[in-house]
């Protein structure tokens, strides 16, 4: 029995723009001190699932990429905006991002983790990427804006995406945008999990094992008889050398006139 697909696989930009906007209405706390980070991580560690996102000041120069300026972590009613550009990357935050018991859900998680690794090497664990799991519900779209439109029927504003995330003070629009991006990931995951999958992932993924190529056997070298060295001539003994040295030198007889004429 096939399961009816509830969500549309794709949605156009025009359809997305016509939807009502969605925004986070809970408490937002901006963290830019070490003590504030400790308190935020302690609170977030008590939750089993939190929303996750990052922001980076845009660069308008080819080949230049800035480091992550902000990391957003949200529960259903409270969002922390952690300003990494104004404080160190604390171990409390590292432990939270490496904790497999606290699920962090976001979109394009792999890209965010790569960017965070420029600040501190992470053994990231407990992450769910909406882009990766969405196909299990027949959804082909990847962007957070379109995932929200398809799953929630709501539009996420992207007006502040290219704003300055290293500014001394955030605007109200920036705060709302950043908090909504992390929180809406929770809402999307909740809606997906309450809906039957049309392409369920296998219980256990079987890895394809590639047998190593066998090297061709080398034929054994033919056994050849060892080359026999030619018997070397015996070296003359010292006694023979001495006799040769003492042997009288015989002068050659001069040719007579008759022989000399014949030679000419």
Spans of features found by a protein language model:
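N-terminal accessory regions of nucleic-acid-interacting proteins
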Residues: 1-48, 119, 130, 200, ...
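Conserved DEDDh/DEDDy metal-dependent 3′-5′ exonuclease domain
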Residues: 25, 29-32, 36, 45-49, ...
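Short coil/turn segments at secondary-structure boundaries
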Residues: 160-163, 201
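Mixed-charge, glycine-rich, non-catalytic linkers/tails in nucleic-acid processing enzymes
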Residues: 176-214
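Arginine-glycine-rich low-complexity intrinsically disordered regions
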Residues: 209-227, 237-258
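C-terminal alpha-helical interaction module
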Residues: 233-236, 264
């Amino acid at each position: 029995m096939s399961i009816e697909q509830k969500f549309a696989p794709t949605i156009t930009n025009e359809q997305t723009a016509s939807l009502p906007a969605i925004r986070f209405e809970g408490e937002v706390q901006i963290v830019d001190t070490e003590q504030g980070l400790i308190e935020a991580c302690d609170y977030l560690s008590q939750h089993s699932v939190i929303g996750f996102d990052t922001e980076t000041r845009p660069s308008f120069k080819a080949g230049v990429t800035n480091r992550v300026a902000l990391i957003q972590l949200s529960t259903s009613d409270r969002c922390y905006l952690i300003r990494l550009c104004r404080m160190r990357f604390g171990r409390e935050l590292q432990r939270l991002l490496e904790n497999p018991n606290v699920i962090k859900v976001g979109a394009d998680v792999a890209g965010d983790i790569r960017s965070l690794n420029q600040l501190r090497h992470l053994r990231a664990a407990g992450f769910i990427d909406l882009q990766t799991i969405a196909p299990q519900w027949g959804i082909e779209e990847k962007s957070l804006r379109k995932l929200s439109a398809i799953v929630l029927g709501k539009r996420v504003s992207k007006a502040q995406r290219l704003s300055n995330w290293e500014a001394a003070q955030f605007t109200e629009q920036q705060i709302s945008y950043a908090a909504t991006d992390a929180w809406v990931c929770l809402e999307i995951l909740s809606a997906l999990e309450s809906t039957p999958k049309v392409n369920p992932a296998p219980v256990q993924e079987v890895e394809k094992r590639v047998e190593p190529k066998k090297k061709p056997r080398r034929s054994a070298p033919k056994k050849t008889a060892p080359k026999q060295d030619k018997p070397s001539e015996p070296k003359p003994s010292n006694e023979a050398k001495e006799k040769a040295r003492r042997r009288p030198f015989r002068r050659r007889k001069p040719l007579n006139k008759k022989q000399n004429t014949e030679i000419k």
